[in-house]
Amino acid sequence: MRRLNRKQTLIFFYAFDIVLVIAIALFSIPFSCSSRSTLESKDESMLDPANAGSVVKIELRNHKTEKSVVISREGSMWIGTDSNSNNILKWPCRKNLPESFIAEASRKIHMVNKARNSKSHENFSLEKGNCLEVNFCGPSGEIYSSLFFGDKNAVTKKICYRTFSSNDVWEIESHIEDFLSTDADFWVDPYIFPQCVTGLSDQESSSLLRHGKLAYVKPSPSIKPLKVFEKNFDNTAKGIFSFYEKDGSYIVIPMFTGGISFSEDDSDAVKSLSYRYSISQLTYKKFFEREEK
């Protein structure tokens, strides 16, 4: 057998070392990925379930559009206001919607870490001027959870978020995105006779007339309403509805007082409602056909 000279021997051992290093590196990749995956994922809720029952205010702000909605619990009711009226006009929330939002935020979900520094926030639409902010607040003004949400990924259908106190970006698959709206019409009770006033269930209210979009207008004191209608509900609550004609449709301004079974806080809540909304000519006609028969 031919013996290798010194130079050939060194080349052989160098080549063997290189192959060995590559083999070790390739062999360790699955373990590295597995370990990294374990470290970068977790099952956690965005809102501590222990605080869920104490949430009395939810703030939503879209930093891209500068629109905001604030929902507050007053008595047993949820009352909303929004930036379109400079948070002046108050409207009743859609029944059970705030509770469903809180429940979804406090549900434990699977999260995967996508980034760990603020420089990556722009890649996920999570920088301060481009995200949607949600704050869940307690009775003393404390913020239980401050969250920032980016855009939904068109491919994975998932959404990323971060918290106020951390730069970590987490990707989640959650129904939380169903509630991430600063459109007041999404949150407002859709019925002309709101459920917080009537006390009716969803099934009982399903046949009631619905109103159109919220209106941010203030009729001049010199303009008298076209019609004023008073409604006494079965629970002894009362509503007064003023109808104004505008551009082929109608603007309705309701006022309410609570019934005898209402707590003081609930009575104050319904009395504070100051919203107004539009209805179509058809809805106007149906309303008086039903109520004046």
Give names to the regions the model predicted.
Residues 1-293:
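Secondary-structure "cap/kink" motif recognition
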